[in-house]
Design a protein with these regions (language model features):
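C-terminal, surface-exposed recognition/capping segments
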Residues: 5, 10-12, 16-173
Length: 173
């Protein structure tokens, strides 16, 4: 090893086994939602308006709008349809421009854009999702994720070979 330079291993044995330290279990740090937190957001919490709706923002971005527990929809913006629908409710039924979305966001709504997933070197244009921080099974080869591709909206497990987006959150005091 040359002085001042780190050493690297090309051994396949060390790939994917190095510990990763993050703020996931540290107070007031950014982290990824757990499986139970995704389930809570989508399925079990009580919300005054609804928990979520599929939407199409700015004429080009599909995704999911998450509504806060106490949400009042802006009176001059068309209310979304298909609230809490996990079936094939169309994204295009709820189309919002920049001005409309700004009002919804000011009222507390959050938008999760539908980013394509990856499978090895391939982009999968029919599967969208966000990883959770919860592993599935004993081997750690799979994890739970929020799946909202096609006609589905659920929290389920998938091999970590697939590449999904992550959404970082930070607890608010």
């Amino acid at each position: 090893m040359m002085s001042g330079r780190p050493s690297f291993s090309n051994s396949a044995i060390t790939w994917g086994t190095n510990a990763i330290s993050n703020g996931g279990n540290t107070a007031n740090q950014w982290r990824t939602l757990t499986k139970d937190e995704w389930d809570y957001l989508l399925n079990t919490r009580t919300a005054s308006f609804g928990r979520f709706a599929k939407a199409y923002l700015f004429g080009s971005i599909h995704g999911i709008i998450l509504f806060p527990d106490n949400y009042t929809h802006p009176s001059d913006v068309t209310a979304p349809t298909g609230i809490n629908a996990t079936d094939n409710t169309s994204w295009n039924n709820n189309e919002y421009n920049t001005e409309q979305w700004a009002k919804m966001e000011a009222a507390g709504a959050v938008f999760l854009p539908a980013a394509y997933s990856r499978y090895g070197n391939y982009v999968v244009t029919t599967s969208y999702g966000y990883w959770s921080s919860t592993a599935y099974g004993d081997q750690g080869r799979a994890a739970y994720y929020l799946n909202f591709g096609g006609n589905n909206l659920s929290v389920t497990d998938m091999s970590r070979y697939y590449g999904y987006s992550v959404r970082f959150v930070k607890d608010v005091n």
